[in-house]
Amino acid sequence: MPRKIEVVDYRPEWESMFKEEEKKIKKILGKNCIGVYHIGSTSVKNMPAKPVIDIMPVVKDLSLVDSHNKEFEALGYECRGEFGIPGRRFFAKGGDNRTHHIHIFEQSNQTDIQRHIAVRDYLRSHPDTAAEYAALKKKLAAEFPYDNDGYCDGKEEYMKSLEEKALRWQAKQNRLSTGISLGICFGAAIGTSFGISFDNTSMGMCIGISIGLLFGSLFGSMDRTDSSGQK
């Protein structure tokens, strides 16, 4: 019988399960590993999810990962290769009682890396969307308890829309962060000039940085459009 699809309430131990596995993965991948990220629904606090920890290691060179297959197998993982996504190495642990998935990407593959990070961070920052997505998954799990294709197909359109919103939101957050950083630098320069002019460096810096933060925030919040008018 196929593996049963279950969506359960959030479990605090998911974070510690990730951290425990993170140490093992870093030890296996060694210096090739740049970072290991907890992704998927189990990485979003208070969000119901399938009780499978999704882990995304990022490496310098993906071609070196296959040489570690025996080490991953020793930890209980099945090595599945790309498993439908070019540029990925996928590992599954737990058999029919699945507990972990590992999705390894090379650092040059920012498209896949950023879409995973963007969705995670968007759901963490938008609890209403997280609740909506969880409700959809619970509905699909009840409708397709032993049909993984039916479950995945049922949320495909929602996930596409979610990824698009998450990536736009992430881009805006990045612009805002850049704008604020530039504003602080610009404000500090203005503040120094004010301080020298009025013989009060502290006051000048406060005024300058405040002005810089204001303009930096406005700059970072501006919508960007391309030549076709698309954001």
Outline where the language-model segments fall.
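Short, flexible turn/loop "capping" segments at secondary-structure junctions
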Residues: 1, 46-50, 113-114
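Helical scaffold of the NTase/Pol beta-like nucleotidyltransferase catalytic core
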Residues: 1-37, 160
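Active-site nucleotide-donor binding segment shared across nucleotidyl transfer reactions
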Residues: 25-63
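Short amphipathic alpha-helices in soluble, non-transmembrane regions
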Residues: 67-75
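Conserved catalytic core of two-metal-ion nucleotidyltransferases
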Residues: 76-110
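Catalytic cores of NTP-dependent nucleotidyl/adenyl transfer enzymes across multiple folds
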Residues: 111-173
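Helix-termini ("caps") and immediately adjacent flexible loops/tails
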Residues: 171-188, 192-231
